[in-house]
Amino acid sequence: MAHTVSLVAPRRQTRPVQVGSVQVGGDAPISVQSMTNTDTRDLPATLAQIHAIAQAGADLVRVSCPDMASAEAVKALVAQAPVPLIADIHFDHRLALKALACGIHCLRINPGNIGSTARVQEVVAAARERCVPIRIGVNAGSLEKQLLEKYGEPCAEAMVESALHHIHILEDLNYPEIKVSLKASDVGMTVMAYRQLASKVNYPLHLGITEAGGMRSGSVKSAIGLGLLLAEGIGDTLRVSLSADPVEEIKVGFDILKSLGLRSLGVNIIACPTCARQEFKVIDVVAELERRLAHIREPVTLSIIGCVVNGPGEAKETMVGVVGGQGENLLYQHGQTIGKRGDAELVETVVEQVEAIAQQMRAAKEKAEAE
């Protein structure tokens, strides 16, 4: 197996916070999260989506609490959720207090928009009592009026100034359990804002491109923006914001981390884009394998190459490999040929091989943890 060349800078050192059972920042793995888009008051629908997001590999899930009934629903959600939950709160400090009382693991608020200093103090006191961190979420689309007047339009400098203002509110109350996000729909503005803030504070940073768009365009924008920052060692948790099923956000988030060698979840399929030389239907096989192997969490590498031009070389670098060969496709395992399979048997054989390797990896991990 060849060694992967890393372009990623050393991770920025941040002050860790604890979101339920998940550490964010410090030396913890970069966590991946998403947000439900159901009516939070609809417990069956919201719980079903939380479980689906968690099943996809999410470390954290955020729920919106726009009213008191939604905040009250947090109690039942926390009791049945398989991962820690974050409450998204705006304007009304009573919603934050209710979510805290119901056991939420983290708050996403802007201290400056939930009322007077006394109200902020009340929320911080309740968060401190429960050791619940607060994410300051700055968004280019909702910057303070005075900042828009000062800078003329949303910009990285205005976002950083807003973040520092909210950070200072919590610091003045001696509450350092903070993480911060600075999101814009513009990739360049977002990257510049995170770079600037990263040079000024050591709080964990939640990365994201807000309102990134649909599945294709949003994934590309997020991969570029988040990828740039992660490669510079900036970022402790991330959300890929898509106008799509939240489960897809988790998949794309892990794909970004996987591409940078920062964190792997599931099977990494390397496949050719196909041409006239393909000896089997690569696109159909890859689509079927993605579906059949979606349940696997172990970082198994798999190459699916349609011909002998690049196939053998790729197969030698992956745990399982397939090289097209006129109806008799070569199979590889750990760089060695192990036989041939016809097109009809190909998918089933590869699934069996990958599942067997994943099981070996699980067993080895369990043994190591038990020792």
Swiss-Prot record:
CC cofactor note: Binds 1 [4Fe-4S] cluster.
Pathway note: Isoprenoid biosynthesis; isopentenyl diphosphate biosynthesis via DXP pathway; isopentenyl diphosphate from 1-deoxy-D-xylulose 5-phosphate: step 5/6
Residues that bind [4Fe-4S] cluster: C272, C275, C307, E314
Cofactor(s) it depends on: [4Fe-4S] cluster
Annotated InterPro entries: Dihydropteroate_synth-like_sf, IspG_bac, IspG_bac-typ, NO2/SO3_Rdtase_4Fe4S_sf
Any single biological process term in GO: terpenoid biosynthetic process
Pfam families the UniProt entry points to: GcpE
Enzyme type, top EC level: oxidoreductase
SUPFAM superfamilies noted in UniProt: Dihydropteroate synthetase-like, Nitrite and sulphite reductase 4Fe-4S domain-like
EC number(s) from the headed UniProt entry: 1.17.7.3
Alphabetized GO MF terms: 4 iron, 4 sulfur cluster binding; 4-hydroxy-3-methylbut-2-en-1-yl diphosphate synthase activity (ferredoxin); 4-hydroxy-3-methylbut-2-enyl-diphosphate synthase activity (flavodoxin); iron ion binding
Keywords: 4Fe-4S, Iron, Iron-sulfur, Isoprene biosynthesis, Metal-binding, Oxidoreductase
Catalysis performed (reactions): (2E)-4-hydroxy-3-methylbut-2-enyl diphosphate + oxidized [flavodoxin] + H2O + 2 H(+) = 2-C-methyl-D-erythritol 2,4-cyclic diphosphate + reduced [flavodoxin]
Top-rank taxon, per record: Bacteria
Function comment: Converts 2C-methyl-D-erythritol 2,4-cyclodiphosphate (ME-2,4cPP) into 1-hydroxy-2-methyl-2-(E)-butenyl 4-diphosphate.
Family: Belongs to the IspG family.
Listed name of the protein: 4-hydroxy-3-methylbut-2-en-1-yl diphosphate synthase (flavodoxin)
Organism expressing this protein natively: Magnetococcus marinus (strain ATCC BAA-1437 / JCM 17883 / MC-1)
Gene coding for it: ispG
